[in-house]
């Protein structure tokens, strides 16, 4: 992921490695500062980029972006404890359904894997809403919903980086 090295990993997660692959200069800066603060020996830091994001940026840039009939809201939460799907998704959806949006709920693939029954129950609770207004995405083989969205709502998933840096739209 392209996220920070100190936002989500364990506090000492990178301390004892000799070589670390870095998705960007922000990770290099964070690791160097951590080495300095903790008195750790310098590591070999390899800046390799973030292939997924590089490919998404290229694909999105090559696409045409015709005007849409209505704004698309992509709800794309993480899967860890206290994620939006478990805490507040019903209330969120109730606030936006019927207000002229196309809503896509795209959970992290791990959510469906671990919490399939919850995912199915959520879809059942909103089964009466037409799929052209509320769509529950479970095919993660493309980035189409990321590219189509006008805005993304997420918790602390790194998909926010993919969306905002690829489309230059708000998360």
Language model segments and positions:
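Active-site and donor-binding regions of nucleotide-sugar-utilizing enzymes
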Residues: 1-57
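Nucleotide-activated donor-binding/catalytic signature segment of Leloir-type glycosyltransferases, i.e.
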Residues: 119-138
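Alpha-helix capping/helix-boundary segments
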Residues: 27, 111, 158-159
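Conserved acidic residues
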Residues: 18, 71, 147-150
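Conserved catalytic-core segment of nucleotide-activated headgroup transferases in glycan assembly
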Residues: 46, 51-123
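A short, gly/pro- and small-residue-rich
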Residues: 1-5, 92-95, 167-171
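Structural alpha-helical scaffold elements that stabilize or flank donor/cofactor-binding regions
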Residues: 13, 66, 95, 145-146
